[in-house]
Amino acid sequence: MTTTIGSPQMLANEERLSNEMHALKNRSEQNGQEQQGPVKNTQLHGPSATDPETTATQKESLEMVPKDTSAATMTSAPPPALPHVEINQVSLALVIRNLTVFTMKELAQYMKTNVHTQANEPNSAKKIRFLQLIIFLRTQFLKLYVLVKWTRTIKQNNFHVLIDLLNWFRTTNMNVNNCIWALKSSLNSMTNAKLPNVDLVTALEVLSLGRPNLPTHNFKLSGVSNSMDMVDGMAKVPIGLILQRLKDLNLTVSIKIALMNIPKPLNSYHIKNGRIYFTVPNEFEIQLSTVNRQSPLFFVDLKLLFNTEAEQTVSAVTEATSTNGDSENNEENSSSNGNNLPLNKPRLEKLINEILLKSNDPLLSLYNFLHKYVLTLQLYMVHREFLKLANGGKFSKSNLIHNYDSKKSTITVRYWLNGKMDSKGKITIGIQRTTESLILKWDNQSASRAKNMPVIYNNIVSNIEGILDEIMFNHARIIRSELLARDIFQEDEENSDVLLFQLPTTCVSMAPIQLKIDLLSGQFYFRNPTPLLSNYASKINRAEGPEELARILQQLKLDKIIHVLTTMFENTGWSCSRIIKIDKPIRTQVNTGGESVVKKEDNKYAIAGNSTTNSDVSLLLQRDLFIRLPHWPLNWYLILSIISSKTSCVVEKRIGKIVSQRGKWNLKYLDNSNVMTVKLESITYQKIMILQRTILNRIINHMLIDSLNQLEIRNKICSSEMINEQKLPQYIIQGSNTNDNISIITLELESFLEGSKALNSILESSMFLRIDYSNSQIRLYAKFKRNTMMIQCQIDKLYIHFVQEEPLAFYLEESFTNLGIIVQYLTKFRQKLMQLVVLTDVVERLHKNFESENFKIIALQPNEISFKYLSNNDEDDKDCTIKISTNDDSIKNLTVQLSPSNPQHIIQPFLDNSKMDYHFIFSYLQFTSSLFKALKVILNERGGKFHESGSQYSTMVNIGLHNLNEYQIVYYNPQAGTKITICIELKTVLHNGRDKIQFHIHFADVAHITTKSPAYPMMHQVRNQVFMLDTKRLGTPESVKPANASHAIRLGNGVACDPSEIEPILMEIHNILKVDSNSSSS
């Protein structure tokens, strides 16, 4: 049904629209000025006052509004009832309570925060803020007060009607606002639908008639032959006239083309129907024409010479592009070009006509434009084809992605995304610079080096899926050839796509497994896989290159060997531990010549030797298997080290101890001396049963070795060959019926004594620990290097038994009941031997330091030595006692106790308080014995002297000891008030070019003694007679220097002498200073 302008239907529609617009305008005026914006925008759809083409009839029809009818309708109907609101109503008491609580909180918060304001802020600002708060709170209470007063003035207290009225206003206002904003949104969304020049007449024609009324000039195009027939009062164009015009156009086009420069790609053309047809194979066919010779060529039609599937792909692009064209050409856009490929012909026509009109070489410029357009379109068609393959095709499982760059006119494709072998496949599609054609390039170095394997493809638009299949097939061939070159796989003669890998089923048999490559995903998979093969298939697919894949397959082979050995040992009663994982692999005989060990995943290790090539480094793998029997000691295992290569597999057997500490497995002991190496093919059930019966004795021997290692005692087990060939001393191996019942271990003396070197010069460096299982005895054999004082003294408390066949050899013996506590017996042996070590060392040191005829050992016990070394000390049987304090493991302390009658007893506090080596103590006692002997003589002489004449003058002598290096003798006369101090120091003196320790004797603090002092003559006499060491000017035979002091030298204000000279020099000084002052003055 169609309506015309000015019809009754059109006027009725306009009247209804006018009434609605007036009602909408009245409502918007009640809502305020803020809602007028959207209402004004609705006038954009009305008739334009400035449009000159708007007719008076149209304006009259648009302005007809029956206002009276609308007013009568509104007054006749009663107003509707207001909807009653019963929700969100709060009582007045609750409102007052909430407002009061809010006010108190605001005041309290202000008082708290006002204290922390800035100090330099004036008080007026604080008062103003407080006043503003008070006014705000007062306003809230006033609003509530006004509301209460107002409600009381309403009749019948029906103030709820006001609430319902307010709710109705808000709802109505919201509806109007929603309508206004919806109209505004419609205007904004219809921006592209507006004409540049508003033509309301034509718009109304299209709206009412469906098409504009264009002039036809009384002609109607038709193919009817009778030109005289009239159709709707219009004459038809004669057919003859049409044919003649076409012939004239053919001639005109021929002449015009003959005068133009035709590029080589456009040489294929023909002229018919008044047009010239240029055809470029596999690209396009364009039709051009002209009006006369003076007019340029113009566009008529264009066809793209692609296949049907590609054309259907491009149709989506051209349809989307055609929507952006001019509105007046929408009807033409829907037409087809004859090959079911919709194009944006109006846009192309405009561009092509502009090129033909403005270009100096129009046909060349036209070809360049269309050629680039076709290449771009073909590239986009390839992009659409990839989208189709990735979304719904065979590559829909995320095995292929591509990146389309329209600016660079390239497509980058990556396939085999889930596979990592030889990185991800890469393909680049773009325009080749030399040929300016669309090509596909396969970026693969191996394919570039290979012969008869293409990497560049042309004509890709119609065959993109086939090209991808060929590239993936060739890529799989390259990977297979690289793997076959490593001599790990074998090629299947029946199926060239299959790789065969040999896996052991038993120790002596192998079976092949088949490995293939999925051409779509690029992943490896096994045919008829087991759970183990499925697990390794995922590892193989994570391999970065052929080297890593070959190593993973070697790990698969090693795991299969482990499974075979584990099954064999478990079937014969052994238990295999699968939870033990050590940090470092067992160092085998394969990797003892400077090889490196590289840890891999799942506790596997790649072992690289110096003799292996780089390609074989990662193909030599090691795995350690820990097995044991149920009755074995705890933590002891038989360790099988399986070393697998491409062609063979060897197994090394060792005994070790593995302990779990803090959740980590630690290898505490490992036997590397008796390693058994066998090939995998030689392991049988019979040999495993024999191993069960012969390995227990080795376990016990290694337990003893481990106990010694825990004590950090270096040891070496003596093999049965050494015992049988009698390479050991005869007294060690005698007394045993068979060598199977004894174990002999060589121990190092220094490590047995925890690093002490005290007996290196006394005992032999090696000892022998002999365990007799039949008699349950353990002995420790040792031997003196030379005849010492200890050999002459038999000490029963040390439990030392000397060997009759060897006078210098002895042994310590204990009986045991449990080999698990053998450490306790070794501790006892160590304690006794340490006592012997210290005792022997002390005796040897005493004989060395006290080399005199007066030295004599009085008593010798395990923990005590008493000896005499002074010449004239006969008051006691001993001069010194050495006590050795021990604990359960070692020597705790060694103390030196001087006897009370010993002149050196004065230094006992220094020996007790200072921790000095007993070697130093012995040397010190010997060096200072003559000094203290002289001091004892001086003290005894002064203490036993009595003055019978009753003289009041007597000299007192005191001995002082500051430390072990400085002594003093004080001569003091209380009657005369004189005090003379002699200092004796131990000093290192350079004498005859070498350092030597001597006694330095000199006066101390002589500044207070003047020439008038009574003590000055005695000091002067000592300086001239003793310190000067010059007796010529003294002239008296008593002052001649003693012969024992011939080595004394002058040193500063005193004299330095040896221990042998200290006594005569001190006695000479004492003879001078012991005289009373009154006797010396007289």
Curated annotation (Swiss-Prot):
Where N-acetylthreonine occurs, residue numbers? Answer: 2
Composition skew (Polar residues), residue ranges:
29-59
Please name the InterPro entries in this protein's record.
Med14_N, Mediator_Med14
Could you list this entry's UniProt keywords, alphabetically sorted.
Acetylation, Activator, Nucleus, Phosphoprotein, Transcription, Transcription regulation
Name one cellular component (GO) term.
mediator complex
Gene Ontology MF: a single term: transcription coregulator activity
- From what superkingdom does this record's organism come? Eukaryota
| Entry annotated with the keyword Phosphoprotein | yes
Q: Which residues get modified to Phosphoserine? A: 7
Q: Does the keyword Iron apply?
A: no
Compositional bias of kind Low complexity: 321-340
In the record, which positions carry Phosphothreonine?
A: 1036
- Subunit structure comment from the entry: Component of the Mediator complex, which is composed of at least 21 subunits that form three structurally distinct submodules. The Mediator head module contains MED6, MED8, MED11, SRB4/MED17, SRB5/MED18, ROX3/MED19, SRB2/MED20 and SRB6/MED22, the middle module contains MED1, MED4, NUT1/MED5, MED7, CSE2/MED9, NUT2/MED10, SRB7/MED21 and SOH1/MED31, and the tail module contains MED2, PGD1/MED3, RGR1/MED14, GAL11/MED15 and SIN4/MED16. The head and the middle modules interact directly with RNA polymerase II, whereas the elongated tail module interacts with gene-specific regulatory proteins.
User: What is known about what this protein does?
Assistant: Component of the Mediator complex, a coactivator involved in the regulated transcription of nearly all RNA polymerase II-dependent genes. Mediator functions as a bridge to convey information from gene-specific regulatory proteins to the basal RNA polymerase II transcription machinery. The Mediator complex, having a compact conformation in its free form, is recruited to promoters by direct interactions with regulatory proteins and serves for the assembly of a functional preinitiation complex with RNA polymerase II and the general transcription factors.
Question: Which PANTHER family has this protein been placed in?
Answer: MEDIATOR COMPLEX SUBUNIT (PTHR12809), MEDIATOR OF RNA POLYMERASE II TRANSCRIPTION SUBUNIT 14 (PTHR12809:SF2)
Protein name, entry field: Mediator of RNA polymerase II transcription subunit 14
Give the species this sequence originates from: Saccharomyces cerevisiae (strain ATCC 204508 / S288c) (Baker's yeast)
Name the gene for this chain: RGR1
